[in-house]
Amino acid sequence: MEKLFNRSDRIAQELQKKIAAIIQHSLKDPRIKTIITVSEVQVSKDLSYAQIFVSFLESDNNEKVKKKITILNRASSYIRKLLCKRMKLRIVPNIIFHHDDSFLKGNKISCILENLTKKE
């Protein structure tokens, strides 16, 4: 029987859990006082880089979102250090944070579809 997931997929899932816990419990930056959701993690095949896609509860203002992403990217070395302690990997990937706006796009589409059904 073949494995359903390759190693990078399993590591991405584990990174998603650990980074979400670190952001919620260990990151004490007062500039980030909103709920942050780690929606997806993409790991390179050689496990040297990980792209972390996050969404914010209050993500209406694009400028605030960019500031929060910048803050998270500046704290990525601290988060990586905590990951080294919590995960048993020989190489812990470098972390790059990106904003995931798929929830907002999906919400806009559902509102448009809802308005279309009301007009009919």
UniProtKB/Swiss-Prot annotation:
Coiled coil: none annotated. One of its GO terms (biological process) is maturation of SSU-rRNA. The keyword DNA damage does not apply. It comes from Buchnera aphidicola subsp. Acyrthosiphon pisum (strain APS). Monomer. Binds 30S ribosomal subunits, but not 50S ribosomal subunits or 70S ribosomes. Belongs to the RbfA family. One of several proteins that assist in the late maturation steps of the functional core of the 30S ribosomal subunit. Associates with free 30S ribosomal subunits (but not with 30S subunits that are part of 70S ribosomes or polysomes). Required for efficient processing of 16S rRNA. May interact with the 5'-terminal helix region of 16S rRNA. PROSITE patterns: RBFA (PS01319). This is Ribosome-binding factor A. It holds the Pfam family RBFA. GO terms for cellular component: cytosol. Keywords: Cytoplasm, Ribosome biogenesis. It is found in: Cytoplasm. NCBIfam families: rbfA. Its main location: cytoplasm.
